[in-house]
């Protein structure tokens, strides 16, 4: 598993958590087919746990930069992609362009073309430090 796959798996965990699941060990390893202890599975776990720990601040950033979209209105898959990406932008000290590109790759696989454009706009606004 590479980092993009780790992001996709983290997005799935965040989505499952949002839909009422617990993102527990069974989901993380058995259902996703991820092996514990691998560098990327550790990264996936760090992303998931970081998003959950910082969910309020992450959602505030998304809501502020989503140009008229409330958190409740955003598609749940798109929201999961955004949450993981915003966590990476804020806490992982990775280049913003790389984080955004990888997040768009995940969105392209799991969401719609319009969603990719929306996610790109929100993440670009956040990366530039702008407000809606």
Language-model features, listed with the residues they occupy:
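N-terminal interaction/assembly modules
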Residues: 1-116, 120-132
């Amino acid at each position: 598993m590479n980092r993009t796959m780790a992001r996709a798996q983290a997005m799935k965990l965040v989505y499952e958590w949002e839909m009422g699941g617990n993102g527990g060990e069974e989901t993380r390893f058995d259902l996703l087919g991820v092996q514990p202890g691998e560098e990327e599975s550790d990264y996936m776990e760090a992303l998931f746990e970081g998003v959950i720990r910082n969910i309020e601040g992450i959602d505030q950033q998304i809501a502020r930069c989503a140009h008229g979209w409330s958190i409740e209105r955003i598609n749940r898959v798109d929201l999961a992609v955004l949450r993981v990406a915003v966590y990476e932008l804020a806490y992982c000290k990775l280049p913003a362009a790389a984080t955004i590109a990888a997040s768009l790759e995940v969105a392209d696989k799991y969401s719609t073309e319009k969603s990719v454009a929306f996610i790109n706009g929100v993440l670009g606004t956040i990366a530039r430090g702008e407000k809606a």
